[in-house]
Design a protein with these regions (language model features):
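Conserved catalytic core of Hanks-type protein kinase domains
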Residues: 128
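N-terminal accessory segment detector
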Residues: 1-91, 100-117, 131-147, 153-175
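A helicase ATPase "motif cassette" and its flanking acidic/Ser/Thr-rich regulatory loops
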Residues: 94
Length: 175
């Protein structure tokens, strides 16, 4: 039952992007269609992830941010199969085992759109780089294994919290 609900939500949300991509590919070519639809999909991804990744105001501590993001990720647990991998005062690491949106894009035959659906967290991380750091080494949209999100305080000394991890080398197109 839960998998059916995830399937319906993912396919309903991604159908307009897939249809637009196929229609624009005929009219403008695949590259231009990918750029236009990808930008729109990234913007929607940022809006939807904005409900999960909380704002961190200047007077907030990282521990307040961390407790809110854990609460927010937990509320989406049924949709995404989210697990808290580890946490400390300086970081929170999540593992997302299921993404109905990238699954739908692959089912529709448009896996090239997956990276745009997965770009929202990196865009939000870039906007907040003066407040916290972000790292992700796996993504459902690229390697399909899982999605591992790690949010670090600026004071964190862990090796994975390098600012350069915000950029994904496979992203060559502008959003």
């Amino acid at each position: 039952m839960l998998n059916t609900l995830r399937w319906i939500i993912g396919h309903a949300a991604m159908m307009p992007f897939t249809f637009s991509y196929f229609a624009l590919s005929v009219l403008l070519g695949r590259r231009k269609a990918l750029s236009l639809v990808g930008k729109a999909l990234s913007n929607v991804s940022v809006m939807s992830l904005g409900t999960i990744i909380p704002e961190m105001h200047n007077n907030d501590s990282f521990s307040d941010f961390k407790s809110r993001i854990i609460r927010n990720f937990s509320s989406y647990k049924l949709l995404y199969d989210v697990e808290i991998q580890s946490e400390s005062n300086e970081f929170a690491e999540f593992k997302v085992l299921n993404c109905p949106f990238t699954s739908a894009l692959r089912n529709f035959g448009t896996p090239e759109l997956c990276r745009f659906a997965c770009a929202g967290d990196f865009i939000i991380a870039k906007r907040n780089r003066s407040r916290w750091k972000f790292s992700r080494t796996h993504s459902h949209g690229t390697d399909g294994i899982c999605c591992n999100h790690t949010y670090f305080s600026l004071d964190c000394k862990r090796e994975e919290s390098v600012d350069g991890k915000i950029e994904r080398p496979e992203e060559k197109e502008r959003y």
